């Protein structure tokens, strides 16, 4: 459909494998695809109406996840599902991130990756915690519309604290790097 209806690419595609996939927004798109690596694809098309799509997927280069890769993939997928469940009229934009990042923090805690003595609540504390940010250095969502990061220039308090209303389109893109 995109080939026939698309206006062009919506933004520079991100295609990264191996260690490059750990670099947020790797747009050099260089490097080898090696057996056992994961491939991160982040691409979108701008349609004739000038709206832009944003799709991110992580795939095993050889077609099979290792056990460790599957464990992390499933955690990120669960975080995405939690974020999607939080998208509803009346919720705050930040509720989507909060739901997804809680799942990320719970997994990091279960895996023993949070500092000793740090529980999930402490990890999520916005003033004294944020321990999960070592592995997820970005927000979970952004509005999607005429720009791939629609409303990106809005004041932070108006954007993150904004109430979701019918008709809004947003992404839910948690990750672990």
Spans of model-derived segments:
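Active-site neighborhoods and metal-handling regions in enzymes and metal-associated proteins
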Residues: 1-177
């Amino acid at each position: 459909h995109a080939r026939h209806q698309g206006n062009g690419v919506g933004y520079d595609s991100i295609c990264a494998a191996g260690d490059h996939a750990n670099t947020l927004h790797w747009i050099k798109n260089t490097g080898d695809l090696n057996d056992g690596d994961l491939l991160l694809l982040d691409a979108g098309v701008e349609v004739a109406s000038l709206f832009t799509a944003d799709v991110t997927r992580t795939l095993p280069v050889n077609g099979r996840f290792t056990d460790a890769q599957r464990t992390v993939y499933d955690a990120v997928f669960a975080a995405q599902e939690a974020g999607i469940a939080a998208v509803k009229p009346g919720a705050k934009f930040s509720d989507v991130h909060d739901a997804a990042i809680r799942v990320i923090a719970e997994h990091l805690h279960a895996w023993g990756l949070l500092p000793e003595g740090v529980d999930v609540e402490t990890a999520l504390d916005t003033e004294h915690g944020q321990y999960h940010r070592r592995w997820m250095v970005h927000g979970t969502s952004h509005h999607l519309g005429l720009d791939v990061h629609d409303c990106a220039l809005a004041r932070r308090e108006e954007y993150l604290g904004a109430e979701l209303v019918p008709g809004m389109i947003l992404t839910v893109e948690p990750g672990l790097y």
